UniProtKB/Swiss-Prot annotation:
Biological role: This protein binds specifically to 23S rRNA; its binding is stimulated by other ribosomal proteins, e.g. L4, L17, and L20. It is important during the early stages of 50S assembly. It makes multiple contacts with different domains of the 23S rRNA in the assembled 50S subunit and ribosome. The globular domain of the protein is located near the polypeptide exit tunnel on the outside of the subunit, while an extended beta-hairpin is found that lines the wall of the exit tunnel in the center of the 70S ribosome.
Gene: rplV
Recorded GO MF terms: rRNA binding; structural constituent of ribosome
Organism, as annotated: Karelsulcia muelleri (strain GWSS)
Keywords from the UniProt entry: Ribonucleoprotein, Ribosomal protein, RNA-binding, rRNA-binding
GO biological process: translation
HAMAP family named in the record: Ribosomal_uL22_B
InterPro entries for this protein: Ribosomal_uL22, Ribosomal_uL22_bac/chlpt-type, Ribosomal_uL22_bac/org-type, Ribosomal_uL22_sf
Protein name: Large ribosomal subunit protein uL22
Subunit structure: Part of the 50S ribosomal subunit.
Keyword Glycoprotein: no
Domain of life, per lineage: Bacteria
One cellular component term from this protein's GO annotations in UniProt: cytosolic large ribosomal subunit
Homology family: Belongs to the universal ribosomal protein uL22 family.
Amino acid sequence: MESNNYINFFFKKKKYTKSVADVRNIYCSPRKLRLVADIIRNKKVEYSLFILKNIKNKGGGIIYKILLSVISNWKNYENNINNYNIYIEKVLINQGYQLKKIRPGPQGRGNKVRKRYSNLKIIINSKFNNYYGT
């Protein structure tokens, strides 16, 4: 009898409250993505989806698609699907690699052109935590 309880203790289904999406090498500069990320940080998911849908910015469409992916990841682990109590806990945007080119400039010189890529990580949580910044 005790061995059965011992086995159930280790094989219990864990309840996940967080969900993460980590996307690498997005063709958009980190500066453009951070402008949008500052608007939706620490907000409800429904409210932030509404903002991202209506924003006219390159980063808005990119973050909108990734946020939908995070929500679907969260729904895979949670049984009770309710979007009303999900919050965006963290949005981390870092610089990826740079593609460097040389463009012809005036008087025979060459000007550097840097195409910047970025890395994005979004964490959503069902419990609201007062994390300001990050």
